[in-house]
Curated annotation (Swiss-Prot):
This is Heat-inducible transcription repressor HrcA. GO terms for biological process: negative regulation of DNA-templated transcription. The keyword Acyltransferase does not apply. Transmembrane segments: none annotated. Negative regulator of class I heat shock genes (grpE-dnaK-dnaJ and groELS operons). Prevents heat-shock induction of these operons. Belongs to the HrcA family. It comes from the Bacteria. The gene is hrcA. Keywords: Repressor, Stress response, Transcription, Transcription regulation. SUPFAM superfamilies: GAF domain-like, Winged helix' DNA-binding domain. GO terms for molecular function: DNA binding. The keyword Transcription regulation applies. It comes from Streptococcus uberis (strain ATCC BAA-854 / 0140J).
Length: 344
C-alpha cells in the first residue's frame, strides 16, 4: 500500500493524464496539493520506484504505468455522477419502440461504442442458463416448414427448413412429440446432451432411416447453443490497439467465451487492466457489467479499450447503460407478454 499523499498524487496524475494524454509534472499538481514542488517530485519518484508511474521520453513529467492504472481501479475508482449531456444522450438513444430483443441490445452496443470510441460487446443470457419452454412445427407447404422454439417463456425463435424427402406430415408430428416428451422444460445444456445421446436411440424406433432426421434436429437446434452477442466499434480497435485485436473481435463466439471467463458467477462488475489471458486483449482494459434481463436472468455489457482510458467516465457510462437496459427490457417483455413470435 502507498501513503495517503502518494495515493492523492497518483489519482490526480491519472485524472490529468486521461484528459490530456500528456505527461504530468510537479507544477501541474501544485494547484491541487498543498505542499512544495520538491516534495511532490520526491513522492513521484517513490511512486516510480514502486512501478506505478513511468518516465516520459520527451519531457520531465510522469505518466501512469499499467500497474498504476490497476492500483487506481482496485483502490480509488468510484462511481462519480455522469455528465448530464451523457445521460441525455443515453436516454435519448432509447426513445423508440422496440419490436425485437436484438434491436435493443444492438442499439446499446452501438451507442456506447459511438460515445467512447472504443469497442463494446453485449451478451444475452448464457445459453446454458436458458430453458426450452415451448416447441412447435408449422408446415408452410409440401416442401418447407417452420420450427418455433421458445426459450425462458419469453424469447421466441423461428427456424425455417426444407422438409426431408419422403417425409410425411405424421413424421413432423412425431418429431414434435419427441421434443415435447424428451426436451421440453430442460435447460439447453441438457438439450445438447440429449441430442447427442438419447435422441438418436429414440429415432431408431420411429424412423427406418435416421441420418436425415438427426441432421434436421441438428439444424433446428444448433443456433440455440451459440452465444447471442452484439459487437460494435470493431474498427475502433485499429486506433487504440491494432490488427490482432480487430481480428479477434470478429471471432464473436471466442470473444463471448473470453468475456465470461473474466467474470465469476457472483460478480456484478469487473475492471480488468492488462489482465486478460487472451493475447489480443492482454494489453487492454475490459470493463464488464452484469445487467438484469427481466424474467430470464443476466446479460453482460463489456467495454474494451486502452489501458489509459478515462475509467471514471466509462465505468459510470456502462453502469447507467445497464440500468437503462433493465428498464427498456422490462417494458419490452411486458409488451411481448408471450403472445408474439420473433421471426428472423
Amino acid at each position: 500500500m502507498i501513503t495517503e499523499r502518494q495515493n492523492e498524487i497518483l489519482n490526480l496524475i491519472i485524472d490529468l493524464f486521461t484528459q490530456t494524454h500528456e505527461p504530468v509534472g510537479s507544477k501541474a499538481l501544485q494547484a491541487s496539493i498543498e505542499t512544495s514542488s520538491a516534495t511532490i517530485r520526491n513522492e513521484m519518484a517513490k511512486l516510480e520506484k514502486l512501478g506505478l508511474l513511468e518516465k516520459a521520453h520527451t519531457s520531465s513529467g510522469r505518466m501512469p504505468s499499467p500497474a498504476g492504472f490497476k492500483y487506481f481501479v482496485e483502490h480509488s475508482l468510484s462511481l462519480d455522477s455522469v455528465d448530464e449531456s451523457d445521460i441525455y444522450q443515453l436516454v435519448k438513444a432509447f426513445d423508440f419502440e422496440a419490436f425485437r430483443l436484438e434491436d435493443i441490445l444492438a442499439k446499446a452496443s452501438q451507442v456506447l461504442a459511438d460515445m467512447t470510441h472504443y469497442s463494446v460487446a453485449i451478451l444475452d443470457v448464457e445459453p446454458s442458463h436458458q430453458k426450452l419452454t415451448a416447441f412447435d412445427i408449422v408446415q408452410l407447404s409440401n416442401h418447407d416448414a417452420l420450427a418455433v422454439l421458445n426459450l425462458d417463456e419469453s424469447k421466441p425463435q423461428t427456424v425455417q427448413f426444407a422438409i426431408p424427402k419422403n417425409f410425411l406430415t405424421r413424421d413432423l408430428v412425431k418429431i414434435k412429440e419427441i421434443v415435447d416428451e424428451r426436451l421440453l422444460g430442460r435447460n439447453l445444456m441438457d438439450v445438447h446432451y440429449k441430442l447427442r445421446t438419447e435422441i438418436p436411440q429414440i429415432l431408431q424406433k420411429y424412423f427406418t432411416v435416421t441420418d436425415n432426421v438427426l441432421d434436421l434436429f441438428e439444424y433446428i437446434f444448433r443456433e440455440l447453443f451459440q452465444e447471442s452477442i452484439f459487437v460494435s466499434g470493431k474498427v475502433n480497435a485499429l486506433e487504440y490497439a491494432g490488427l490482432d485485436t480487430y481480428q479477434f473481435l470478429n471471432n464473436e463466439q471466442h470473444l463471448a467465451f473470453t468475456i465470461r471467463q473474466g467474470m465469476s458467477e457472483n460478480e456484478m462488475a469487473t475492471v480488468q487492466v492488462a489482465d486478460s489471458n487472451e493475447p489480443a486483449l492482454a494489453n487492454l482494459s475490459l470493463l464488464t457489467y452484469k445487467f438484469l434481463i427481466p424474467y430470464r436472468g443476466f446479460g453482460l455489457l463489456s467495454l474494451i479499450g486502452p489501458i489509459d482510458m478515462n475509467y471514471r467516465r466509462n465505468v459510470s457510462l456502462i453502469n447507467v447503460m445497464g440500468r437503462i437496459l433493465a428498464i427498456k427490457l422490462r417494458d419490452y417483455y411486458r409488451y411481448l407478454n408471450s403472445n408474439h413470435y420473433e421471426v428472423n
